[in-house]
Amino acid sequence: MKFSLVATIVLLALAQGSFAQGAADLESLGQYFEEMKTKLIQDMTEIIRSQDLANQAQAFVEDKKTQLQPLVAQIQEQMKTVATNVEEQIRPLTANVQAHLQPQIDNFQKQMEAIIKKLTDQTMAIEN
């Protein structure tokens, strides 16, 4: 009877030890799953934040674009007015410059024609 009592105690001790080892494994497995859950939550939160940041940036750009459209239209209108004014001021100046240069251009053309005629006449005289 003592032997069976001792064998039972040893068997209980071994069983308790193996249960303790199983509990430790279970605890480490539970900790691993807890860490995985925490990492997954952090990753998903970061993805949602980055998506939210992209949406905020897009909304900001659209808002500023909407605000700037009237200003751009106003600047374009002012540029058209300035271009018209500059053209009106330059047109008489170009006409004036052309009027001053045209006699000189005509004179230059006559001189070049005279030189070419003289060279042609000299070439004809040499050939004969």
Curated annotation (Swiss-Prot):
Positions where Pyrrolidone carboxylic acid occurs in the chain: 21
Top-rank lineage group of the source organism: Eukaryota
One GO cellular component this record assigns the protein to is: extracellular region
Q: From which residue to which does the signal peptide run? A: 1-20
Q: Which UniProt keywords apply?
A: Antifreeze protein, Pyrrolidone carboxylic acid, Secreted, Signal
Localization of this protein: Secreted
Q: Which family does it belong to?
A: Belongs to the apolipoprotein A1/A4/E family.
Function description: Antifreeze proteins lower the blood freezing point.
From the Swiss-Prot or TrEMBL record, give the protein name: Type-4 ice-structuring protein LS-12
